[in-house]
Amino acid sequence: MTATFKKEVNLVFECETGNYHTFCPISCVAWLYQKIEDSFFLVIGTKTCGYFLQNALGVMIFAEPRYAMAELEEGDISAQLNDYKELKRLCLQIKQDRNPSVIVWIGTCTTEIIKMDLEGMAPRLESEIDIPIVVARANGLDYAFTQGEDTVLAAMVNRCPKKDQLTKPLQAVSFIDTDSLQKEKGPKYDSINHDKDLVLFGSLPSTVVTQLNLELQRQDIKVSGWLPSQRYSDLPILDSGVYVCGVNPFLSRTAATLMRRRKCKLIGAPFPIGPDGTRAWVEKICSVFGKQPQGLEQREAEIWKGLEDYLQLVRGKSVFFMGDNLLEVSLARFLIRCGMIVYEIGIPYMDKRFQAAELAFLEKTCHDMNVPMPRIVEKPDNYNQIQRIKELQPDLAITGMAHANPLEARGISTKWSVEFTFAQIHGFTNSRDILELVTRPLRRNNSLEGSLGWTQLVKSTV
């Protein structure tokens, strides 16, 4: 099989039949337990799940983090033990030791196989221990490990309050000073008096949340809340009049739940990754809220000017996405805007409805930069991809950890895609972090060639 890079006029979508090569989605515990500060995550699975969490998260159990393993034993699988009693014992212990505001049960492959009725047990146990229990089945049947967060957020949508739950108490007690109440309680009560409420969904570090909130405040748009919030008690109001907008491309299940269960109005916008994406994201929200964007063009130009030292390294370079975390389309669009050529965008799963705005923006970016349209390959076959990489010889391959070393041994510079998941890549100011990750292998190669001359030695031995 030979691979040639055709100059396509429109986006080309292909679907192969490859296996999914990704982390287990229960890895979402790694960042969600830190994001929701008053939560406790209980992963219900086997020893394998425990080993994975222990190694992937890098936290020893002696540190007593706010997550734990409910390890299934032979007695559980053979139905000799009562699942309800065992989970009740563990949850009572969690309540006594940590007293969280919410316990999140993370189902795994094993709970699916043995048909554990977690959704049936949770309400009964919740009423007994008086702590909310959210059930999320973040098992290995998903396409990408980032979809674990999608599953948890979709489950939390049903726990978000509705407007009538807050307005009724306020109407019943007429002597309450609502002005002082708004000042005291903040956005949860303040949003009642707005015609259009905006809720953003997606787990981001608090510093990035603040940055995006400020960008919208500059346009006179107030964010009513975030899903997830830092505290479970601060979950945003979700109702039929609320506008919602996502910040990550892997949250299609959450978006569908928001629209179907709570009748929210989804704002379809490109994702705020890179200066171009952040500007388009803010502009789309402004158009929905009837605001004229102020100073966005100038702000984007300033950011690009500050990135010039990195742009000189990547202009004219080629990149190949093997596919791992569903961020590929957004990252490819940003790198094309930086002057790179993207040969192929491999992606485990593509929700074309949720990513419609991002795909249209990718197409527009390719036209503006006068570069060929990349192929988008859904569910790529890694054997075919390796062959195409061998033929195309890209300057950089963004890949999962499993393929990085074999590609490096064949003279292809690589970057782990998982690093983009944990890095701060959203908003105007974090664009530099994306290019820092992308250019690191390129700068390493320049150093080896320029000062040490090791590249020829390596190539001669391959």
Swiss-Prot record:
Coiled coil: none annotated. Its cofactor is [4Fe-4S] cluster. [4Fe-4S] cluster binds at C24, C49, C109. It comes from the Eukaryota. InterPro entries: LIPOR_BchN/ChlN, Nase/OxRdtase_comp1, Protochl_reductN. GO terms for cellular component: chloroplast. Pathway: Porphyrin-containing compound metabolism; chlorophyll biosynthesis (light-independent). GO terms for biological process: light-independent chlorophyll biosynthetic process; photosynthesis, dark reaction. This is Light-independent protochlorophyllide reductase subunit N. Binds 1 [4Fe-4S] cluster per heterodimer. The cluster is bound at the heterodimer interface by residues from both subunits. Keywords: 4Fe-4S, ATP-binding, Chlorophyll biosynthesis, Chloroplast, Iron, Iron-sulfur, Metal-binding, Nucleotide-binding, Oxidoreductase, Photosynthesis, Plastid. The keyword Transmembrane helix does not apply. Signal peptide: none annotated. Component of the dark-operative protochlorophyllide reductase (DPOR) that uses Mg-ATP and reduced ferredoxin to reduce ring D of protochlorophyllide (Pchlide) to form chlorophyllide a (Chlide). This reaction is light-independent. The NB-protein (ChlN-ChlB) is the catalytic component of the complex.
